[in-house]
């Protein structure tokens, strides 16, 4: 679902030229304009098997766009019309990617649902021809096979896949707010059964090749090859092609049957699905679960259920028509535009726009073996980075090392790693109490307590032992990097790398640069973050940077709303029903009252009244009683091991009651409470762009969604302003400003967008 890049190029032939390659039984290629202009696909013939190679130019992946689709139709028509060809193999020339899905830019360019429906119907017709082909077609899958790529593969008569970690099959369209639009909603249930098909399409979950084989999604597996005269990726593709050609010949000769024998469980499932009452119960249960999980905020899952149901109950023709129509409708929804915008932003934030650093970071050192330090260590050794984990305390160091091992061992339990791979990765970690080995470090990341004097102390100690090229990064969430760098002998090598907890699960990394930070230091930080698998935003230095600065005023409003008498459970319900993955009161417990108070006091001193809201005495009293949040077992809720339905902490309710403030009925409806929270967040985000803290709106959206849990269905604060309307946001702010003053005063950039309706953050 992203753009693509070529590894090879198409050869041109005159009418008399033939393709002569080892292992080929060749045929003549006539010169034609279609052949000469083909850039995404080329093919040759091995015996009587056409080997069709997909290799889109200028990208690491193949995507199904208009050009590739047109070329594919041309090639298949040649294959079907040739008497010398009895079968075909579809394979990608790109290592690690079969087809990553449809080109979402093609969908974004459409202005009506009818245009999108037409694209769907064209793809449906093409894949129907594949499905009904009298010449067997084998899909040889190596790497990602997603979305339209999967729909293409399941239209073929046979599928062979490499048993490699990079080979993943899936239908992730729901994550973009759409549904499989090239026949996937109709073929997938028939191939793997309705329950498994629903699971794939409603979650967007990727399926590994070995599991795909058990499900019936793949017919045969091929072991990847190791290094030889050629790189392992190249050897694997060549071997996969050889195996696929053999199976294609076997299918054409009727020596291999494309029909797979179903196991007992599959037979029982098929029988159960033949009973109307059972089917209706399954539809009902799945729909109930979807409504509960999505809270009605995402239309795509319910449409997927509807389309699958139509195909099963009314037949394939009705199913395909419903699929194409619903595909068109969904592509025009605000939710889909928001999710596609996030996808594009995520793609941009996975690139190093600062170029390659002068020296690759091969040796990493981390100061502090606490929750954050150990988390950073885990995502580093996990990616084969040699890592030193240092702490001043032996027990703390032991806990940190154990946390890293546990994280790796969890992957063994989930069969993502073998025990040998776990031990090999863990061997990249060295735990120590001193600075031995720091003279080889290419980067040091400090993750010590949020206290400026302590950070100054470790910075001075580190600079006494590290080499000149070494970058010093601070994992601070709010302390200005320029203040940390004030004691540095080399401020150009000091940078901020703000990770989010838990580090192994949170995708975002916020990198903070000062006026003195060099471009090379930034490039090094981005390179390390990308190795760790992070989505990266780069922001300028300032109090709270971007993420903490946006979250702080919203948390201040949370505190005020709680003081006004809205209970934690009610507030959580209001925020999750708006699209936040975690309720506001629960989020406070996750952050911790001590951290929340520390940030609120520091940023409050700097930003003044704009960051005011609830009374910090609430937090102070909670801290004094040990109610720090989840980490202490009590916060707004009481936390017990294994208990999902948490009770509200009655002692905290008493504190809130003692500090209760009157609510205003005109701004205290459920909707007003939701918008009081969201507008403070959005206004601060736009102000960060106005002040140059943020470089782009896209990075602002990515930071808010992946770091702070801003509702994905809204696309981030900037996409929200575009889709909801800047004027409506300003009107909301003015309404609350009349009561609370500067805390809700809209920033100038937001006012500018409101006064010019055509002015958008995303054109």
Curated annotation (Swiss-Prot):
Keywords: Acetylation, Fatty acid metabolism, Lipid metabolism, Lyase, Membrane, Methylation, Mitochondrion, Mitochondrion inner membrane, Multifunctional enzyme, NAD, Oxidoreductase, Phosphoprotein, Transferase, Transit peptide. The modification Omega-N-methylarginine is found at residue 399. Gene3D superfamilies: 1.10.1040.50, 2-enoyl-CoA Hydratase, Chain A, domain 1 (3.90.226.10), NAD(P)-binding Rossmann-like Domain (3.40.50.720). GO terms for cellular component: mitochondrial fatty acid beta-oxidation multienzyme complex; mitochondrial inner membrane; mitochondrial nucleoid; mitochondrion. The record marks 498 as: Important for hydroxyacyl-coenzyme A dehydrogenase activity. The modification N6-succinyllysine is found at residues 46, 60, 166, 213-214, 230, 249, 303, 326, 334, 350, 406, 411, 415, 440, 460, 505, 519, 569, 620, 634, 644, 728, 759. The keyword Mitochondrion applies. The record marks 151, 173 as: Important for long-chain enoyl-CoA hydratase activity. In the N-terminal section; belongs to the enoyl-CoA hydratase/isomerase family. This is Trifunctional enzyme subunit alpha, mitochondrial. It comes from Sus scrofa (Pig). The lineage of its organism: Eukaryota, Metazoa, Chordata, Craniata, Vertebrata.
């Amino acid at each position: 679902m992203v753009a693509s890049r070529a590894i090879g190029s198409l050869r041109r032939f005159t009418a008399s030229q033939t393709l002569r390659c080892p292992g080929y039984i060749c045929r003549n290629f006539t010169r034609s304009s279609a052949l000469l202009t083909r850039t995404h696909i080329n093919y040759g013939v091995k015996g009587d098997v056409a080997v069709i190679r997909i290799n889109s130019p200028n990208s690491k992946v193949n995507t199904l766009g208009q050009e590739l689709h047109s070329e594919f139709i041309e090639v298949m028509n040649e294959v079907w019309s040739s008497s010398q060809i009895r079968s075909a193999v579809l394979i990608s020339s790109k290592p690690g990617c079969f087809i990553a899905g449809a080109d979402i830019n093609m969908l974004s360019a459409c202005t009506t649902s009818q245009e999108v429906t037409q694209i769907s119907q064209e793809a449906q017709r093409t894949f129907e021809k594949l499905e009904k082909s009298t010449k067997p077609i084998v899909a040889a899958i190596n790497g990602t096979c997603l979305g339209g790529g999967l729909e293409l593969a399941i239209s073929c008569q046979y599928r062979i896949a490499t048993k490699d970690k990079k080979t993943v099959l899936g239908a992730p369209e729901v994550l973009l707010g759409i549904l499989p639009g090239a026949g996937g909603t109709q073929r997938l249930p028939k191939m793997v059964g309705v329950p498994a098909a629903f699971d794939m399409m409603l979650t967007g979950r990727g399926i590994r090749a070995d599991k795909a084989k058990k499900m019936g999604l793949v017919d045969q597996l091929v072991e990847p090859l190791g290094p030889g005269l050629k790189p392992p990726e190249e050897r694997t593709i060549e071997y996969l092609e050889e195996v696929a050609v053999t199976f294609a010949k076997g299918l054409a000769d009727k020596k291999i049957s494309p029909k797979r024998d179903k196991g007992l469980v599959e037979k029982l499932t098929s029988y159960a699905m033949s009973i109307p009452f059972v089917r209706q119960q399954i539809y009902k249960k799945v729909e109930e679960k979807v409504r509960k999980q999505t809270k009605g905020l995402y239309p795509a899952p319910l449409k997927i259920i509807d389309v699958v149901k139509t195909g099963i109950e009314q037949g394939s023709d009705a199913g395909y028509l419903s699929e194409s129509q619903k595909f068109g409708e969904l592509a025009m929804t605000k939710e889909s535009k928001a999710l596609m915008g996030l996808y594009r932003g995520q793609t941009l934030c996975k690139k190093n726009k600062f170029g390659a650093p002068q020296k690759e970071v091969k040796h990493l050192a981390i100061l502090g073996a606490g929750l954050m330090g150990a988390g950073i260590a885990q995502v580093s050794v996990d990616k084969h980075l040699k890592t030193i984990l240092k702490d001043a305390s032996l027990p703390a160091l032991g806990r940190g090392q154990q946390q890293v091992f546990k994280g790796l061992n969890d992957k063994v339990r989930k069969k993502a790693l073998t025990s040998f791979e776990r031990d090999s990765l863990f061997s990249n970690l060295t735990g120590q109490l001193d600075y031995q080995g720091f003279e080889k470090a290419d980067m040091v990341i400090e993750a010590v307590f949020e206290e400026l004097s302590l950070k100054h102390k470790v910075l001075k100690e580190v600079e006494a032992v590290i080499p000149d090229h070494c970058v010093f990064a601070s994992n601070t969430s709010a302390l200005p990097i320029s203040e940390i760098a004030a004691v540095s002998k080399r401020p150009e090598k000091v940078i901020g790398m703000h990770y989010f907890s838990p580090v192994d699960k949170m995708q975002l990394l916020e990198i903070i640069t000062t006026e003195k930070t060099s471009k090379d230091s930034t490039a090094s930080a981005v390179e390390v973050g990308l190795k760790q698998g992070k989505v990266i935003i780069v922001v300028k230095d300032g109090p709270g940077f971007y993420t903490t600065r946006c979250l702080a005023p919203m948390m201040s409003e949370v505190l005020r709303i709680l003081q006004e008498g809205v209970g934690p459970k009610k507030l959580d319900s209001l925020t999750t029903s708006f699209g936040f993955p975690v309720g506001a009161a629960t989020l406070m417990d996750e952050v911790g009252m001590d951290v929340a108070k520390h940030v609120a006091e520091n940023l409050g001193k700097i930003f003044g009244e704009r960051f005011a809201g609830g009374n910090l005495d609430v937090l102070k009293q909670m801290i004094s009683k040990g109610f720090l949040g989840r980490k202490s077992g009590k916060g707004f809720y009481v936390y017990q091991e294994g208990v999902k339905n948490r009770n509200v902490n009655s002692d905290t309710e008493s504190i809130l009651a003692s500090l209760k403030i009157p609510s205003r009925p005109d701004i205290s409806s459920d909707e007003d409470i939701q918008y009081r929270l969201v507008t403070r967040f959005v206004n601060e985000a736009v102000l960060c762009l106005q002040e140059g803290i943020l470089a782009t709106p896209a990075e602002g959206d990515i930071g808010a969604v992946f770091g702070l849990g801003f509702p994905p269905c809204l696309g981030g604060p900037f996409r929200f302003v575009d889709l909801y309307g800047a004027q409506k946001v300003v009107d909301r702010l003015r309404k609350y400003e009349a009561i609370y003053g500067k805390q809700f005063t809209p920033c100038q950039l937001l006012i500018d967008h409101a006064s010019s309706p055509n002015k958008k953050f995303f054109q």
